[in-house]
Regions:
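N-terminal metal-binding scaffold of metallo-dependent hydrolase/deaminase domains
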Residues: 1-35, 44
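C-terminal cap of metal-dependent C-N hydrolases
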Residues: 364-420
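Histidine/acidic-residue-rich catalytic or RNA/ligand-binding cores of hydrolases
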Residues: 63, 225-237, 264-267, 285-294, ...
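Metal-coordinating catalytic core of metallo-dependent amide/deamination hydrolases
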Residues: 121-256
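Histidine-centered catalytic micro-motifs
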Residues: 47-59, 216-223
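Divalent metal-coordination and catalytic microenvironments
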Residues: 6, 25, 42, 53, ...
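His/Asp/Glu-enriched, well-ordered alpha-helical/loop segment
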Residues: 245-248, 252, 292-374, 388-390
Length: 424
């Protein structure tokens, strides 16, 4: 298959008149300055976007949690109520619709941070991985790749209190129970199996290091000040420092959020992947993290829509810059190129897909066409489109060489109808 793009993001810049040749789902030729040829992709063509942090079932909360004042902790109770209702069939139905929404937004790969494992009282299903398999199948039907980040979740607090209520669905009893279940999961061409430490609240210190050898490995880090305070009270150090002592920080480890950090924490994270989720961090009143300081320390930034208050990686990308402006009262912290790299190449790398995220020969053929003629993007410099475009401007999406979104519609199913069905 051959595509032609008037504008395409190649080698960190906008190239003109680019012919893109694809064989067996990979780029075999990328030719800027080419004569017109192949199927035309309109607007600006980007590499596929990587959503590095997702909780698919949180999508059911969108627009339903704003009726009163509150905090992350009051929101969590509403989230637990949703978690208590799902089974493998309803989870598949919801996740398929959510991943379809991601495809419409130009996302070709998702990191699903998965901790909703068992039945309502904590009893495993006949297939102990039925919930995880539902997510993998949902991504396959939506046409996107998935890294299932199966989470260790053993305690309800840093003090080691047992799981209670709906949390019993999340736990496997101990590390060995979790490892036995996860080791039964199998990767496939469109799915990788990774690991997750839910947080220092949910994983005892002596277990942290036992998970460290698994990759990719993701974990929630210092999203709330209360987590830091509880960790210092229990262990005499910050969560970042505790994880460092336990050997968790490895090249393929990703810290998610990293909102409330000390200078020492930032230095430790300088060699890590860090996934930022600005729209969720705003929605839950988490705070503004030190994105520029982390990047300057050497952290490799990626992006996630997390709770799916919105599913729009353009909004996440510019949110990183705009939040820095609010915090510092200055402009110009991140270039468009840095933000697009976070949304593409480093996001894919954090999920274990090193052969995706850039338009280059040999890479997976993922393409996202973004309209430059909408009311949002008309007149913009293509190089700065990330500061204007939204998910609604995505017109075409190619994932592993297959067209999954054509003129704004999913080629496999009606996504709005699927969402209505899943959320009724």
């Amino acid at each position: 298959m051959t595509y032609f793009a008037e504008y395409a993001w190649v080698d960190g810049a906008v190239a003109r008149d680019v012919r893109l040749e694809i064989t067996d789902g990979r780029f075999t030729a990328v030719t800027p300055g080419a004569a017109t040829g192949g199927a035309r992709l309109p607007g600006l063509v980007l590499p596929g976007l990587a959503n590095a942090h997702s909780h698919a079932f949180h999508r059911a909360l969108r627009g339903r949690t704003h009726g009163d004042r509150g905090s992350f902790w009051t929101w969590r109770e509403q989230m637990y109520a949703v978690a208590g209702r799902l089974d493998p069939d309803s989870y598949f139905t919801l996740a398929r619709a959510v991943y379809g929404e991601m495809a419409l937004a130009g996302i070709t790969c998702v990191g699903e941070f998965h901790y909703l494992h068992h039945g309502p009282d904590g009893t495993p299903y006949a297939d102990p991985n039925a919930m995880g398999q539902a997510l993998i199948e949902a991504a396959r039907e939506a046409g996107i790749r998935i890294t299932l980040l199966d989470a260790v979740y053993l305690t309800s607090s840093v003090d080691g209190n047992p799981l209670e209520g709906v949390q019993r669905r999340f736990g496997d009893g101990d590390y060995d129970g979790w490892a036995e279940r996860v080791d039964a999961l199998r990767a496939s061409p469109g799915a990788k199996i990774g690991a997750a430490l839910h947080s220092v609240r949910a994983v005892p210190a002596h277990v942290l290091g036992r998970v460290a050898g698994r990759a990719p490995l993701h974990l929630h880090l210092s999203e709330q000040r209360a987590e830091n305070e509880q960790c210092r009270a229990a262990h005499g150090c910050s969560p970042t420092e505790l994880l460092d002592k336990m050997g968790v920080w490895q090249p393929e480890t990703t810290a998610v959020h990293a909102t409330h950090l000390s200078p020492t924490d930032r230095d430790i994270l300088g060699g890590q992947h860090v996934c930022l989720c600005p729209t969720t961090e705003r929605d839950l009143a988490d705070g503004i993290g030190p994105a520029r300081a982390l990047a300057d320390a050497g952290a490799r930034l990626s992006l996630g829509s997390d709770s799916h208050a919105v599913i729009d990686l353009f909004e996440e990308a510019r949110g990183v810059e705009l939040d820095e402006r609010l915090a510092t009262e200055k402009r110009g912290h991140f270039t468009a190129g840095e933000l697009l790299t976070a949304a593409t190449a480093t996001g894919h790398a954090s999920l274990g897909w090193d052969d995706a995220g850039s338009i280059a020969v040999g890479n997976r053929a993922d393409l996202v066409a973004v309209s430059l003629g909408s009311v949002r993007t008309a007149g913009v410099d293509p190089a700065g489109a990330v500061f204007a475009a939204t998910a609604a401007d995505v017109t075409h999406v190619v994932a592993d060489g297959r067209l999954i979104v054509d003129d704004g519609r999913h080629t496999a199913f009606d996504v709005p109808a699927a969402l209505r069905e899943a959320l009724r």
